[in-house]
Amino acid sequence: ALFIDIVSPGEAARDTHLQSVELLRDTSHVRDYSQAEWTAMLARAGFSVGAVVTARLRMDFADWTARMRTPPVQVEAIRALQAAASDTVARHYAIEADGSFTIDMALFEAA
């Protein structure tokens, strides 16, 4: 089986930023799990994880928020979080002037 998802970088500040912008964009969002959390969840479900392939995915801010019909007040809150992000967070997510950013994703091969 293949599982593909956005993954948290794990480190507290970067994780908090990711979870915050995801929740503001989509109030039904639960959590972006780290690679370690995914591996543990799959193991608990009886899977043995083989290969894990990671990549970075650029998110166009306007498209990303439009897909979920994010209300304008929440779009502005996301922009405010991005503007206030630490250098470490801003660099990790490669936050651009228009709000676009890059996130981590992983593909898990499990049997």
Kindly give the residue locations of the regions a language model identified.
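Conserved class I S-adenosyl-L-methionine
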Residues: 2-29
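Conserved Class I S-adenosyl-L-methionine
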Residues: 36-39, 43-111
